[in-house]
Amino acid sequence: MLLAAVLMVVVIIKRARRRLNGAATKRIRSMIERADRAGEPVLRVLEYDKVLDHLLLELGFTGTTGQKMIKGAARFSNKQALWKCHKLRNLVAHEHGATVSASEADHFKRVLEKALLEVSSRS
């Protein structure tokens, strides 16, 4: 019984990593660079949100992007900004005719990069 409890704790700790390793950080930075080339601001926002989802997945969180953000919110000092960016993505994904300015897309990128910096290994 004790062994099962210890194993469960180890699995939970491994699933919700504290920091991303260098390889994971590099993959996510590469995804951000690809998202930069998506062109129109609305497309960049959609791509940046996919990167956010992948970042949360790499940290060990599961579910929809929103569920992952709820589980991982405490990990980020800019959690409110991350939520605002995800809500912008939801707006453009679900509202016909929704538009995004270049500055809004650029803001999403900056928020995402700050979040990545906070959870990346310091090496």
Protein language model annotation of sequence segments:
Residues 75-102:
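Histidine-centered, metal-coordinating catalytic motifs and their short helical/loop contexts
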Residues 32, 94-98, 112:
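Broad hydrophobic/π-residue packing in well-ordered secondary structure
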Residues 1-72, 76-80, 106, 110-111, ...:
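Amphipathic alpha-helical interface elements
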